[in-house]
């Protein structure tokens, strides 16, 4: 049976929950068109997150890997285009590490592009009435660290496997502690992630439409 690995993070930065894991854990053992979804939680820690991810990939042997993370302040589902080879942490991770301008992979390329049909995924999610867009940066914290490490592995050892990263907004129960911050319901995020998986599994070549940004 084909399997999809989807990951979420533990809470970080003083938050009580992390929306990525709150939604992703609901998808564990979900069957979608003959494909089984396997959910795993990653620690919000440089290095440790990639160790956990690589262990999960070895265990699950997926055809698709989707890593999900919290992007507090963003209003929509944002599918990441690129990961860069640098850790530059504005705040410490959950183990107290705060790397500055450190490469994720020594001698690795400057960046990797996603292995997902991101524009088709955005279009499909929008057609379901859920705000979504292509993001041009995954940041320089643990989310980018995981995306870069994932794509490095896939490019080196699992070239047939699709993979990438999706950022999601705060849940409403988090936004109450951040006045003015946008949020999205867990149900909407869940629907969006199910659509993202379905489209990623079906589409081999992305849509030739704009998903760029002016700044």
Swiss-Prot record:
InterPro entries listed in its UniProt record: Peptidase_C15, Peptidase_C15-like, Peptidase_C15-like_sf, PGP-I_bact-type, PGPEP1_Cys_AS, PGPEP1_Glu_AS
Active site: residue positions: 80, 143, 167
EC number of this enzyme: 3.4.19.3
One BP annotation, GO: proteolysis
Key words, A-Z: Cytoplasm, Hydrolase, Protease, Thiol protease
PROSITE patterns referenced in this protein's UniProt entry, alphabetically: PYRASE_CYS, PYRASE_GLU
One term under GO cellular component: cytosol
Record SUPFAM superfamilies: Pyrrolidone carboxyl peptidase (pyroglutamate aminopeptidase)
Protein family: Belongs to the peptidase C15 family.
Protein name in UniProt: Pyrrolidone-carboxylate peptidase
UniProt organism field: Yersinia pseudotuberculosis serotype O:3 (strain YPIII)
């Amino acid at each position: 049976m084909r399997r999809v690995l989807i990951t979420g993070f533990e809470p970080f930065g003083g938050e009580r929950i992390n929306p990525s894991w709150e939604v992703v854990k609901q998808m564990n053992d979900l069957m979608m068109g003959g494909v089984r979804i396997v959910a795993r939680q990653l620690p919000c820690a440089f290095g440790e997150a990639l160790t956990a991810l690589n262990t999960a990939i070895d265990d699950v042997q997926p055809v698709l890997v989707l890593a999900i993370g919290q992007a507090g302040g963003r209003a929509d589902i944002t599918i990441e285009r690129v990961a860069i080879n640098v850790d530059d942490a504005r705040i410490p991770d959950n183990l107290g590490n705060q790397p500055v301008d450190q490469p994720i992979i020594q001698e690795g390329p400057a960046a990797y592009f996603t292995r997902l049909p991101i524009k088709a995924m955005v279009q499909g999610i929008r057609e379901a009435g859920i705000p979504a867009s292509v993001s041009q940066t995954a940041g320089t914290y643990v989310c980018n660290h995981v995306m870069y490490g994932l794509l490095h592995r896939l490019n080196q050892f699992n070239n047939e496997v699709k993979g990438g990263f999706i950022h999601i907004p705060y849940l409403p129960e988090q936004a109450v502690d951040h006045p003015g911050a946008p949020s999205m319901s867990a149900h909407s995020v869940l629907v969006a992630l199910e659509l993202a998986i379905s489209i990623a599994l079906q589409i081999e070549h992305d849509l030739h439409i704009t998903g760029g940004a002016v700044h």
